Amino acid sequence: MWTADEIAQLCYEHYGIRLPKKGKPEPNHEWTLLAAVVKIQSPADKACDTPDKPVQVTKEVVSMGTGTKCIGQSKMRKNGDILNDSHAEVIARRSFQRYLLHQLQLAATLKEDSIFVPGTQKGVWKLRRDLIFVFFSSHTPCGDASIIPMLEFEDQPCCPVFRNWAHNSSVEASSNLEAPGNERKCEDPDSPVTKKMRLEPGTAAREVTNGAAHHQSFGKQKSGPISPGIHSCDLTVEGLATVTRIAPGSAKVIDVYRTGAKCVPGEAGDSGKPGAAFHQVGLLRVKPGRGDRTRSMSCSDKMARWNVLGCQGALLMHLLEEPIYLSAVVIGKCPYSQEAMQRALIGRCQNVSALPKGFGVQELKILQSDLLFEQSRSAVQAKRADSPGRLVPCGAAISWSAVPEQPLDVTANGFPQGTTKKTIGSLQARSQISKVELFRSFQKLLSRIARDKWPHSLRVQKLDTYQEYKEAASSYQEAWSTLRKQVFGSWIRNPPDYHQFK
């Protein structure tokens, strides 16, 4: 039906053609990360491939995001008008929610071209059965999925581990982030790298299912800029300090790619030991900030949550019969481990039970493309040669949604690019995908639906604040509570007063 390379190429072309220069990295000096949601439509009468005749599908990018930054907790605001987390995956998901809101509006106003059809209960909708959604990311998600075995012939991509820093890697119960002074020096696999990675012979196994772990190595890049080779493997992470398995070419696992995301209070914590035993896998982690701690969970953790609760969030669950799940995740060319992805996104939650009707741990298909994002850290590093100055992450984030009004949204530091201190708090200083604006769009949608056609969850009581609307989505809240009790008990949640806006 489709391949990982086809998804990656579609997203790269969309980024190059549909997104303007504004918000993109400065050539040879900045890099960024890319994520997107792709809608795949199969012919209604042919949902499956057959050996003699593959099904022809229609692929469309419906949301896209770029970004590498988070704001610190001291910059968070209680009126919902700032983006706390601007990592590409989160921007793409919030942009996807804008798209879903628009599609629900089309359905509610009886338009024929909506992705939704009426559900079995009054006032709710469900996704058409000929549609699925695939999530693309140019890089492995930060956090648990980025703890990847490293072979001895690979250049060291992370900063040295100093014992005084390692011993300070834990966090107090009252805080939620990194050791002092580390400031994102050791990031996910697309983080700053001081040496070019060597090209290893071989061809990437580009399509692997969640049930198997295959050794992968990258050969010549198929399209885009010439890049340094990036090697990946799928050796077990647990017990790497004493691992004796030998990879092809007699290369031992000597270290792991580091994630800058730090363990949350209540988790066991990393050992901080030099080499392969540095990280403990499977833990909840918080994204790093520069100086000021953040309250943003890692992308690995958020994507694992989406795989149980859906991508629609609590608000939209009022209007949906079932959660909106991703069918597959495709990762671009980068350091990668199938085992780490499987563990981080699926394995940690696979034994969750007693979820409400419609919710469940999804059999997410996880694949990797052989195509490199041309504005990724490693691609820019390879092209810039002796360019003066440091290579730094782009400070802007781009949101794009397949909606007719203001599809593009460019932000920096959580606000629309160009926002000044004087304009903060005004309507023009709000991102289209901020909590308050998504809530406003949700309320606007409700205003276009006759009250007697609202779902029961919205008619049973008077709701006023963002928090009240979220809490009233009872099935979603029950599923989220179950997930926290059974697996994610240390998940950092913002206090209710951050959700009291109207």
From Swiss-Prot:
UniProt: 1D-myo-inositol hexakisphosphate binding residues: 93-94, 302, 305, 435, 470
GO BP term (any one): tRNA processing
Metal-binding keyword on record: yes
Enzyme Commission number(s) of this protein: 3.5.4.34
Residue numbers spanned by region Disordered: 174-194
Chain positions with Phosphoserine modification: 191
SMART domains given in the database record: ADEAMc
Protein name, as recorded: tRNA-specific adenosine deaminase 1
Organism from which the protein derives: Homo sapiens
Encoding gene (name): ADAT1
